[in-house]
Amino acid sequence: MEKVSNIIGYFKDELSEVAKEGEVVSWTYISIEYLLGYTRSDCIINANRDVSKDVSDRFKQIVSALKTNKPLQYILGETEFYGLKFKVNEYTLIPRPETEELVDWILKEEFSSALDIGTGTGCIPIALAKNKKAVISAIDISNNALLVARQNAKINGVEINFIHQDILISNDLPKVEIIVSNPPYVLESEKEMMF
């Protein structure tokens, strides 16, 4: 059996040429918290605790996937946004920290209804619903993305009116006070530099 300290060393040794040290450290502790439930300080306290072979193998799978430049959020199938847990997969984009600023800005406004266009994971409407008593709707053209968004709403205990619709060919939108959309804004040429 391996120890927690061995797992930490394994991440560092295997990924030091793949990413900068700070990113490797972040991946390490996010993965440990995901699989073992340990915070960074728990890792110090439990450095000599045994890790089962199954869990050790899972850490190795994570490292292998990181070496292919697959984002950790997709490997784990989840991310955090606005202090909430969200499922993510290949049908959704990973919420960006800048989008939290957009949510902050919207929450400063008084409103009783809002619509998110191109919802993806549902992170914007779910964060709004967790922090404001309002009727929130969300539209996406992708049924697969809406499936993830519905799961995220359930996980976070909020009700959102999810609508499968192509915003470009439909004018049948809910009447709301606020409309928000945060479509992808990374250029195709920039994608390679992100990973």
Which residues fall in each region the model found?
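Secondary-structure boundary/capping signal
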Residues: 19, 23, 39-40, 71, ...
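Non-catalytic, surface-exposed connector residues within folded enzymatic/regulatory domains
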Residues: 22-26, 53, 75, 96, ...
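Conserved AdoMet
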Residues: 34-108
